């Protein structure tokens, strides 16, 4: 999902290995964890949740979004679980946000992301 001047969302791959791993893990949702006080500033990586039939805002463990909006997206605070931050190459996130999308906010062309997790 690509929403210019707001977020990019990914993680839900249609690759066969991803489908296999999801079957092994099973279907489950995670409760929001908003007590840490992390704000949805530009570059924050957070967990999305559906607003449809989801009053407790449970999140998919298989997806994530990155705040691209300059100035942050603080209206998301308290509703979604931030768990990381882009520390290099925000220009890549900006370039993804510049891609053409269809009416469902899906990129016209496949965008593959390689993500490296750095622990403190």
What are these regions (language model features)?
Residues 1-120:
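Cyclophilin-like peptidyl-prolyl cis-trans isomerases
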